Amino acid sequence: GKTATGVTYLDAQGREVFQPADVVCLGAYALWNVQLMMVSGLGQIYDPATGEGTLGRNYSYQTIAAVSAYFDEDTWSNPFIGAGALGMTVDDYNGDNFDHTDLGFVGGGYISANQTNGRPINYQPVPPGTPGWGAEWKRALRDTYQHHVGIVCHGSSMSTRANYLDLDPTWRDAYGQPLMRMTFDFPENDRRMSAFLLDRAAEIARNMDGVREISTVNRAAEGAAYSIV
């Protein structure tokens, strides 16, 4: 393979500059680290047809599902109070911490209920069936903001040969570099694992005092989609 001896970048005037270095650290997050190596000619890009190459092979991330618990008006969650990531985590269903007999999957994940300071843009809990905007949405948000708790499931993501990263043969960025292309779908193993975790989280939510309704979302379910970058 090749050895990185520095970094080429564009300065504020758009001029190409080479900065030599004895050590080059990749610190652009996993996806962009892979892209940097690919456009720099470092390593062999994975070819799914032949199975050769390691760069971009077996891309995996995390498998997300969640429960929203809506409480009666006498039960207050006060989402604006907390330390940013204050909460409790159940680790009983992570990895090999539980018996997988007849479950049909390997892996697992943690189940967590936490407070993130009720961030005004990120935290907008409304019951299922609420319109996405308008007066009814505002009314629902006002009524549920202080009577809601979220429970999230962060599950494992098993690597498969069908999930990988490579360079797009068509699309390029403003500087002429090929864009990163992701080929990914949840394997059946992860779908089963996520459904199992979600059932456990929903069970916890239903047994909370004061809960009047719950809703669930499984991002790995068949037909579901979300940004995994």
What residue spans do the PLM features occupy?
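Flavin (FAD/FMN) cofactor-binding core of flavoprotein oxidoreductases
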Residues: M208-V229
